Amino acid sequence: QNDVKYSRLVATAACRQATNGRDFIKRVRKETKLKLEIIKPSEEARLAVIGSVGHLKAKTEQVLVVDIGGGSTELVWLDLTNVEPKNRKNSIMLMQSNQLRRKELDKLTGVKVVDWISVPFGVTTLKEQYSDVEEDKAAYAMMSWSFEEYISHFGPSQSDDLKILPNFQIIGTSGTITTIAATKLGLQRYDRQKVDGYEMTSAEVGLEIDRYLTGGPEWRAKNPCIGDSRKDFIMSGAAILRSILRVWPTNTLTVADRGLREGILYSQMVKQGFLS
C-alpha cells in the first residue's frame, strides 16, 4: 500500500530468551509474510547507541549508553578522544556490531569500544526474579544489589580515573529513564518535547527514586506518568538505573526518548546511502 522499498523488522531479548522464540518468528512469517529477525545482543546494543547519538555533546570524550529494556539491559562504553569533536556523531553512526564484540579501536572512525555488556535482566525479567518478595523497599534493594553484581566487572571501575574525566556523559534510553524525567518535571501528561534531551545528575535521579519508594505502590499508581500498570515495573527499572549511577556517578545523564527504532532507521539510511 505504501510502496515500502526498505525495511528491517527485529525481535530482541524476549525472543532470544523464549524457548519458542524461533517458532514465533516462523508463525509471524507464515501469517503476515513479514520477516522478523532475532538480533544478537551486540547488534541490539549497537542500534541503541546509533539511535541515541543525536544527544551526544560536542565536548564528550567518554560516553556510556544505557538501554534498559524489558528482557535485557545493554551498556556500551565508548572512548571518543581520538575523534575530532565535529566528527564524533557521524563516526558512531558507522559503528558495526563486530566492532562491539571485539572491543577495539576502529582505525577508520577512531571510535574505541572500551567495553559493552548485555545483562539478561530488564524491567520485566528483574521484577519476575523477585516476584516472591512482597515488601516494596526490600524488593527494590534486592533487585538493585543483584544488578550491581552483574555489572561489577564492566568498564572502568570506581577506582579508575573516571572521577577526574570532565567530559564524561551518560545517555539513557528507556521507558524507565524517560518516566523518571517526566515525574521530576511534574508533568501531568507525558510530553516527549520536554523529556527528550532533558538532563539530570545522579543525585537528582536518586532523589526521584526515593520519592517513588516513600510514596509506595499506591502513590506511583496515581502518578499520571506512571500509572497502575507500571507501578511495579518502574521500580525494577529504577533499581537498574540507580545501580549504574552508583558505580559511575555523573552530572550529565541525558534522557533519550529514542533508541532501537531510531537506530534501525539511521543504520538503514547509512546502508542504503541516504546518510553519509
Locations of regions flagged by a protein language model:
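Catalytic cores of RNA-modifying enzymes
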Residues: V66-I68
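Active-site loops of AMP-binding adenylate-forming
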Residues: T81
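Helical "lid/coupling" subdomains associated with nucleotide-phosphate turnover
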Residues: Q1-V4, A13-Q62, W77, P85-S276
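Acidic, divalent-metal-coordinating active-site segment for phosphoryl/phosphodiester hydrolysis
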Residues: G70-L78
